[in-house]
Amino acid sequence: VSNTMKAPLIRELVLKLPEGQPFDYRAGGFMQLTAPPYRLDFHDIEIDEAFTDSWRIAGWQEMRGSSDSPVTRAYSIANRPQDAAEGRAVFNIRLAAPPPGREQEIPPGIVSSYLFALKPGDEVQASGPFGEFHVQPTDREMVFIGGGVGMAPLRAMIHEQIGKGTTRKMRYFYGARSLADLFYVEEFDAIAAEHPNFSWTPALSDPAPGDRWTGATGFIHDNVRAAMQKHPAPEDCEYYLCGPPVMISAVLATLARLGVEPHSIFNDDFGV
């Protein structure tokens, strides 16, 4: 249906589901998406004007992607309740670009390249949804902690809870590198404005000089520690984590120091 750029390396991919087929979806689930054999020249990918400078400086349009056989990867679903009702599945696709200076020896991600280049009308082989990463049916306060495309399942969970009219307190800590890497900002600002039981803290670890960022800075686990140290009972909250492995490890160590037991922590590392 659409494949919209949200950050220099992140697109929101919206797929229309086959009519008449059951879609047993719960927020936090994922699907398996398959890239067929393909050849791709990144010069052929249309880049939004807002991100052309980032692409030019990084030299990403010089990359080429290819696969000689089908390859499948898991991607978390970023749906809001209305998306599923309209027969759509939403994903946050992060293009796995090689480290700077190593483009000639390390190819970009096989499946992420294919999905990043999709255009409206293209068909995608998909299966699912799957997964056990869901909000627990309790009355405890929920703390969501994400980074990168770890946004996807957490966004779905928050929208699911809002749609149910929950009165549970919810906090969302989201880490990005710079302002260009931050997305769905207006959406979460609006939720926070309309729902007093929801608050969110976007934090930038390396804001660009031109960002004029006045919000939280530093790594997300440090922001979580600073906020939850002031909480009367951080061990009584539930924690939902999704993001890069290094972020997950740092957050788990932070939560352990706060006295949070492992049974109160739920995490997923699909699609990161």
Residue positions per predicted region:
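Conserved beta-strand elements of the Class I
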Residues: 141-145, 240
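Conserved S-adenosyl-L-methionine
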Residues: 139-140, 163-170
